[in-house]
Design a protein with these regions (language model features):
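Extracellular, repeat-based ectodomains that mediate carbohydrate processing or recognition
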Residues: 1-225
Length: 225
């Protein structure tokens, strides 16, 4: 693009597949051009074992929504589809990547940050698979200052965690669902008045935890109900 003096937005997304537990990798393949430069990429395993990747994408003319790629066994692209439809027009990277999980029924769940109707928010939704992805059950997560949400699943459980500044302290909060994302109960996990990292929801066997590092309290692990 530079050689041809053509306009170019974002960066390329590449993936490489390992079939021996990470000891070696097949040659990398490009998934797509025009990803948002600084938002993290998330990955998950689809119901049939195929790798999935989700990232913030720059759609024409300048909408920074999200894309979802599904790979073939050799690491080449099977499909790349638009995954969210909030149509946020911004000429810059918001530094908020999504999170994606697939539950035991094969349902894809995602959380992401976007601006919709003029306000920046964290959202949750189920990404219905098919010839074109549709978002089901989209709902706001947290309040107007919610940020950097993450999620994980265990049998019969779906958990979302995020941090949110209340004007004085940064709160760590969570949502739990036992019905596949149809309804949620909110829980307060912790708070800090210092700097903090992005929380991560992790799974060990059938138990879910939230892992959070803060400047004053250090590393902490919170078991979820």
């Amino acid at each position: 693009a530079k050689a041809n003096k053509a306009p170019w937005r974002g960066a390329g997304i590449y993936a490489a597949v390992s079939t021996d537990g990470g000891r070696s990798f097949q040659p990398e393949h490009k998934l797509a051009d025009h990803s948002c430069e600084c938002c993290r990429v998330t990955s998950a395993i689809d119901a049939d074992g195929a790798p999935l990747f989700m990232w913030r994408h720059v759609f024409e003319p300048n909408e920074r929504d999200h894309a979802l790629a599904r790979l073939k066994p050799d690491g080449t692209v099977e499909s790349v589809q638009r995954a969210t439809f909030d149509r946020w027009k911004v000429d810059g990277c918001p530094h908020h990547g999504p999170s994606l999980v697939v539950d035991e029924r094969g349902v894809r769940h995602a959380v992401w940050f976007n601006q919709k109707d003029g306000a920046g928010r964290v959202f949750y939704g189920r990404l219905a698979a098919g010839s074109g992805i549709s978002v089901e059950g989209q709902r706001q997560v947290g309040g107007p200052r919610a940020a950097h949400a993450d999620m994980a699943v265990a049998p019969g459980k779906l958990a979302i965690a995020w941090k949110e500044f209340d004007g004085e302290r940064t709160q760590l909060r969570g949502l739990m669902s036992a019905d596949g994302g149809d309804s949620f109960s909110e829980i307060a996990l912790a708070a800090t008045d210092g700097a903090s990292d992005q929380a991560r929801v992790i799974r060990r066997q059938n138990q879910l935890f939230v892992f959070w590092r803060t400047e004053k309290e250090g590393f902490r692990l919170f078991p979820l109900p």
